[in-house]
């Protein structure tokens, strides 16, 4: 059995990982920001330290890492969280700086392995260099820098796996799903007889499967050096995905009309104006987003299955996420937002 130290053990993904690891007989200790989401299924065997890891001293962190075999970073922010300019500073603070600080402490404490939750946009940047994604999207750039920090930390006694995560579905009681943003975007078209949407698609999996992937990566036998693993269990076109979304919203047989990027781009100028007005520095270039969403960002499930991930009901997970997002959007439930720290 292994001892594992995790940052973000009460979050949607960290909690799933902890549950899987504990079920498999490992010990998990985590630092998390209070408050706990109401009714969240946090495993009682997990040793929880409440507080902000960034406010703890090196000595305190080193003490927590003492005797641990693996460090899991299940915290950070994704591209849906809004920040003022310069957005890179915030990505650095939440997604990169903690690793630069904790990796050396891991090594001092004798921790041999780390697993970091990254983004499949890094995978896209690497396979489509012609799109210049990192120049135009600070979020993409920050995730590639994060991978670089992980790569540089590796040595003969320390290996790091970055899980390049795609769209994730599933809910945690008391926590607002990130998909509330999607409801905000599409509900504006509810009065139209159809929904206009890009023609691409995406890789995806359920939060339970992400938990299994994290556990598999953490306990991987004979892992050496740096690995960036593109994660996916299902690939779905946007129109099929939206079909499930609209069913979950009670709008049956909704007509989805695929539009080319230039048409979606026309609608994005308003968003650029809105960001300017509100002082938001977007992590994604709104004028390039139509081209990203026109692409089938599909990934084979091979690498994920290699980590011991099992099948799950993706349609049920999407439905669940959307139902809670819809309620949240309508203001029916008080839910905790994703926190950066």
How should each PLM-predicted stretch be described?
Residues 51-97, 101, 123:
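NAD(P)H-binding glycine-rich loop region in Rossmannoid oxidoreductase-like domains
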Residues 4-24:
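N-terminal Rossmann NAD(P)H-binding glycine-rich loop of SDR-like oxidoreductase domains
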Residues 294-341:
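Amphipathic terminal alpha-helices
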Residues 242-297:
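Terminal hydrophobic/aromatic helix or amphipathic segment near a protein terminus
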Residues 151-174:
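Conserved beta-loop-beta element that borders a ligand/cofactor-binding pocket
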Residues 97-141, 161:
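Conserved Rossmann-fold NAD(P)-dependent oxidoreductase catalytic core, especially the SDR/UDP-sugar
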Residues 170-183, 217-228, 251-253:
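Glycine/proline-rich active-site loop of Rossmann-fold NAD(P)-dependent oxidoreductases
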Residues 184-205:
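A conserved pocket-lining segment of Rossmann-fold NAD(P)-dependent short-chain dehydrogenase/reductase
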């Amino acid at each position: 059995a292994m001892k594992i130290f995790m940052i973000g053990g009460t979050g949607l993904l960290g909690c799933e990982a902890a549950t899987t690891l504990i079920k498999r007989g490992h010990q998990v200790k985590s630092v998390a920001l209070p408050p706990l989401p109401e009714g969240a299924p946090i495993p009682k065997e997990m040793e929880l330290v409440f507080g902000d890891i960034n406010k703890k001293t090196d000595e305190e962190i080193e003490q927590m890492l003492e005797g641990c075999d693996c460090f899991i970073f299940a915290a950070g922010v994704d591209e849906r969280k809004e920040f003022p300019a310069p957005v890179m500073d915030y990505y650095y603070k939440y997604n990169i700086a903690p690793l630069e600080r904790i990796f050396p402490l891991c090594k001092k404490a004798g921790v041999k392995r780390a697993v970091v939750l990254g983004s499949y946009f890094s995978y896209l940047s690497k396979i489509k260099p012609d799109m210049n994604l990192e120049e135009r999207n600070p979020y993409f750039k920050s995730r590639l820098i994060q991978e670089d920090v992980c790569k540089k930390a590796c040595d003969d006694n320390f290996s790091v796996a970055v899980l390049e995560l795609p769209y994730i579905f599933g809910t945690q009681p008391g926590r607002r799903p990130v998909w509330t943003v999607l409801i905000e975007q599409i509900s504006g078209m509810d009065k139209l007889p159809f929904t206009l949407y890009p023609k691409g698609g995406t890789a995806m999996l359920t939060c339970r499967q992400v938990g299994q992937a994290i556990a598999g990566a953490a306990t991987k036998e004979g892992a050496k050096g740096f690995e960036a693993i593109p994660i996916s269990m299902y690939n779905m076109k946007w129109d099929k995905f939206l079909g499930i979304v609209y069913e979950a919203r009670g709008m049956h047989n909704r007509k989805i009309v695929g539009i080319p990027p230039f048409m979606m781009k026309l609608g994005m100028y308003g968003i650029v104006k809105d960001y300017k007005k509100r002082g938001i520095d977007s992590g994604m270039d709104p004028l390039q987003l139509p081209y990203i969403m026109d692409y089938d960002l599909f990934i084979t499930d091979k690498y994920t299955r290699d980590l011991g991930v099992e099948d799950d009901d993706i349609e049920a997970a999407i439905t669940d996420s959307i139902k809670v997002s819809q309620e949240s959007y309508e203001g029916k439930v008080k839910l905790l937002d994703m926190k950066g720290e």
